[in-house]
Amino acid sequence: MKIFEALEHERSWSEEERLLLDQVDRLTAEIIAPNAARIDEAGAFPWDNVEAINRLGLNAIFVPEAYGGAPMSFRLYLAVVRRIAEACASTGIIYATNFHAMKPLIEFGSEEQKTRLLPRIAEGGLAALAITEESAGSDATGMKTRFQPDGDEIVIDGAKIFITNGDVADRILLFGKHAGIDDPRQAISVLVVEKGAPGLETLGLEKKMGHRGSSTAALRFDGCRVPAANLIGRPGDGLAILLASLNRSRPSIAAHAIGIATAAFKDMTAYMNERKQSGRRIIDFQANQFMLADLATDLAMAELWLDHLAGRIDAGAQDFGIEASMAKMRASDIANRIVTEAVQMHGGYGYCSDFRVERLMRDAKITQIWEGTNQVHRQLIGRSFATK
C-alpha cells in the first residue's frame, strides 16, 4: 500500500482538516469497522454508527455556518466519505445521502427554507433524496408523482422506490411534477417533506444483495400535505436542480466506491503476502503481480481524478458534469474489478462470510447502478464529443 500511503501523504490538508481526518480514522477503527460484519449479517440500521458520526459533527461539514454548520472543503467531505465507506459501506452511504439530499436545498433554497430546515441536519438529522419510481429510473421525466397546490399547502400523490434513508429521514427532498404544467420536463419540481407529514407512508424495505445496514424504502404519498413554502425554487425548476445536484452527488459516489475498493485491495494484498502455494507466496507469482499492478494503477488514477474534480469544485467551477460522470463511472468500475479479484485471490475462503471480501463484493455492485447507471454515464461522456 506504499503508493496509496504516499498519495495520502502528499495531499495538502490544513491543520484543522488533518485533525478532523485523524478523528475520523479513530472513529472508523474503533466503532464503525468493528460493527460492519454484524450490521451486514443482521441487516440492521447502524444507529450506533450514526450517533458516533453525529458526536463528531460530520454532518456540519457540508452545511453553511449560518444554518448551524461548520463548513469545510468538498475535497475534505469526499475524504470522509471514502474513510467511512472503507470501514462500512452501509454507514458510508447513509452519511453520503445526507449530503446528496440537502445540497439542493443549500444551493437553491430560500433563506427562510434554509433557516427552518437545515439546522436539524447540521446537528445530526437524517435526509433522503426521493427521485426514482417504478416507471422513472434513468429517465426522470417519466415520474408520475404529482404536486397539486391547495391554498398555502401542496398536496402530494404518488410513490417512490429505492429511497436510501427513506424510512428514517427527518427531511426528504422529493421530486415530482407540478400540476398545470403539461411539458414533462418543465413540470418537474422539488420540495421538502418533513418527517411525520400526514399522508406519508413507508410501504416496505428492500432486501438487498449488499449495503444491508442501509435501509432502502418504498414510499407512498397519499394526499400528503406539506406547506407550499417547502417548494424549492419555482414550479418547473426541478429538472435543473436535479441535474445540478447529481453533478455533486456523483463524485460522492465515486469516493464511496473508492473506499470499498481500498478495503478490498488491502485485504487482497495482505492475504497474498501470507498465503503460500507450491512453496511460494501467491504474491510472488508473476501473473498475480501483473494483476496487482493494473488494479493499483487504475485505483490510483481514480483517486487522482477525484482529487482533481474536487479541487475544481472547491475553486467554484460550475460546469463539471462530464468530469463527474467520469469519476463515478471509473471509480465504480475499478471497485468491482478489485473486489472480484480479491475474492478470486482468497479462493474458496473469499466466498465465505468469515472474510470481509465476500461482503465487499456484494457492496460494490450497486455503485455501478445508483446515481445513474454506468451505461448512462458512458452515453453522457460519449455524447459530449458529438458536434452540434
Feature locations, PLM:
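Flexible, small-/acidic-enriched active-site or ligand-binding loops
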Residues: G142-K144, G196-P227
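A short, Trp-centered hydrophobic/proline-enriched beta-strand micro-motif
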Residues: E123-T132
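A short, charged helix-loop
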Residues: A217-A244
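Short Gly/Pro-enriched turn/cap motifs at secondary-structure boundaries
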Residues: S135-S138, F162-N165, I181-D182, K208-S215
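Alpha-helical interface subdomain recognition
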Residues: M1-A87, T91, F108-E111, G124, ...
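N-terminal glycine-rich flavin-associated loop
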Residues: A89-E112, G137-A140, Q148, E153
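A short core secondary-structure module
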Residues: E153, D157-T202
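Short Ser/Thr-interspersed hydrophobic loop/turn segments at strand-loop and sheet-helix junctions
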Residues: G57, V81-A85, V193-P198, D222-R225
